[in-house]
Each structure stands twice: as structure tokens, then as C-alpha cells.
């Protein structure tokens, strides 16, 4: 969730033609689908090699934060060049690698695979609902941005505190709040594309990807707490 901060880049694309807006939306959905492949590969590699165990605790958080900020900076710098897509896909592999610790822990449950598929299906459902809402809502949602940003800051601070406290209740509260905030961000970001506020499909993909990955990992964490079964 912390890397979401780096994606809030001002973009004055309003007033573009409907044809261009539709093109950006199509390209965004195409690249978003493609980005899931490196994510799965990264998660698989992390679980298969066991490197995911090194991405826990404070040190794991530091590695995650440094890597995410570095990748996001590189993506924003190259989003208008041929290097933008490969760097974005590299970032999604990195995110899959960082997810591998949670995936590995979930697979430790007897119903772990089922929990992962449930989290995936739930995330897909949230995305479909938000995409549908974005197409029917006529009002300008740009005012949501600053409030959602504040929400992300609060989540970040809460996550850092909980790293040291190690509270399960705190983790659950943060996860539930993250699902709500990043679901709203999906609506906000898709609406921006539809309205012409985002004209670069790489930036748009990055924003939506971060929303999706945060909803997924938060939902999976909650499912592990409430639905994890051990033999």
C-alpha cells in the first residue's frame, strides 16, 4: 500500500476526445491483464525458492518500500518511452516476489489454495463492480483524491506501528480499511481514465495494479485469519 503514494502524479488530460479516452482504457485493461503474469511468476518463484521468508518484519518492509519507490520512479520517468512497459512488468514481478511470504503462509493451511482463489475472485469482483460504477456515475469524483490520499497515509502510519506492535487485531483493522480505501481508489482511477483525466496507459495501469494488489493481499490476510484451517 505504501507505494501508492508515488502514483499520485498530476495529469491534466481533461478535454481529450472520446476516441482517445477509449483507447487509453483499452490499453490499460490489456496491460493490466498482462501485468498479472509476472506477478504470478514472482510469487511462484518466491515460494519455490523460499526467498519469501526474508521479506518479513521491519527489514522486509524496508526492502519493499525502497524497491517499490525505485520502480515507481523509474516507471514515471519512462512512461512515454519504449522502456515503460518492461519496467512496469519488472515491478509486477517484484510485487509478486514480495507477496510470496503471504502466499507461502496461506498455503500452510489445509485450505490455503482455496483461500487464495477466494481472495482472487473477491478482488476480481470488486474490480468489476468499481468498473461498472465508473461507467454510470456522471458526477466528477476528482475531489475524492485528496481524501483517499490521506487514508493511504493513515494506513502507512498504522502499518509501520503494527510492525513493532505485532497486533493481530491491528492487522485486521488495517486490512479492512485497506480494502475499503483501495476499492474506492479503483473507482476513482477508472473514472479519471473515462473522463480523460489520465491519458497515459502505463500510469493508469500502475495505479489500478496497485489498487488490485492491495485489495488482494488485504483480503487474503483476512481470509487467513478467519478461514484458515490446519490439519
Feature locations, PLM:
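A hydrophobic alpha-helical transmembrane-helix feature that marks the membrane cores
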Residues: 1-231
